[in-house]
A protein has these predicted regions:
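Structured aminoacyl-transfer and RNA-binding surfaces used for tRNA recognition/handling
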Residues: 1-220, 230-235
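Extended, domain-scale alpha-helical bundle/helix-rich regions
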Residues: 241-277
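Aromatic/basic-lined ligand-recognition segments
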Residues: 225
Length: 277
């Protein structure tokens, strides 16, 4: 029987008296990003407010649109859901460490390959780790977002990082785990393609195709879906097909004349996106 990872996470939170919320929108919680890139974005301003105390958890749909042209190469994420657990001056790192191990091993029945942590935290954090785990140091186990930062611990299963705990500001906890990655390790296979899911979520958030910001990302993803011949059915797809056809015709008529020009030139001068034609 396959494990329902999200249901198990909800059960895990309930058993540990941690309030749990299911977020459904990729709209960002501030104007620093086009879409919500992580589960902690809505809580980011609480880490430095020393009078705030408490613990909560969520699952947050996320969309990361860096390197759109590389989507599909197996290494660049697009749309995914992040399981998060956040504690503001309430849980200790040892508490958080015990909790995440319990979720991964007791609820999901996964076997931890190794645990990595920053060299500066070996002396302090190693006593939390059972001798049966392989421990490695990694200087990259340091998270930073502007002036907010923290050392972190990473957990690996089958050579894949499945979860991490950031000791944000030294007195807070930010735990994150990718839902789809955990589902794959638990034998759950989803049929929907990431580009299709991203398009669906952007439209659900009331964005429409346009030349800028969120609308441009939607337009770009629609174009990639058409290029990959993915089954897409929404009110914008025919309009996008027509736009791409016009670009293709213009490019064919002028490529000999301007063939050596860069992709940036074609886009800025004539609105032609070479990747789509």
């Amino acid at each position: 029987m396959k494990i329902n990872v999200l249901k198990e996470y909800e059960r895990f939170c309930e058993n540990n008296s941690i309030p749990f919320e299911v977020e459904t929108s990729i709209k960002p919680y501030n104007d620093s990003t086009l879409f919500c890139p992580s589960g902690m974005q809505q809580y980011a301003n609480l880490f430095e407010k020393k009078w705030i105390r408490g613990t909560c958890a969520n699952v947050q749909p996320c969309l990361r649109v860096n390197d759109l042209d590389k989507i599909g190469d197996g290494t660049h994420l697009l749309y995914f859901n992040m399981l998060g657990l956040f504690s503001f001056r309430e849980l200790t790192m040892k508490n958080a460490f015990d909790l995440i191990l319990s979720f991964l091993e007791d609820y999901l029945i996964l076997k931890i390959d190794k645990i990595t942590l920053h060299p500066d935290r070996v002396y302090e954090w190693t006593p939390y780790i059972n001798a049966r785990y392989k421990v490695e140091t990694d200087k990259d186990c340091l998270w930073t977002d502007g002036k907010t930062e923290g050392y972190c611990i990473e957990f690996y299963v089958d050579g894949i990082e499945v979860a991490n705990i950031v000791n944000t500001c030294g007195d807070c906890i930010d735990m994150g785990a990718g839902l789809e990655r955990l589902e794959k390790l638990c034998g759950v296979v989803k049929d929907i393609e990431p580009i299709q899911e991203a398009i669906k979520k952007i439209i659900e958030a009331d964005y429409t195709p346009s030349p800028t910001k969120q609308g441009y990302i939607l337009r770009k993803l629609l174009g990639l879906a058409i290029k990959k011949k993915l089954p897409i059915n929404n009110k914008f797809i025919e309009e996008e097909k027509s736009r791409i056809e016009k670009m293709q015709n213009f490019y064919k008529e002028n490529k000999d004349k301007f063939g050596k020009k860069s992709k940036e030139w074609w886009k800025e001068t004539h609105g032609v996106e070479i990747d789509l034609v």
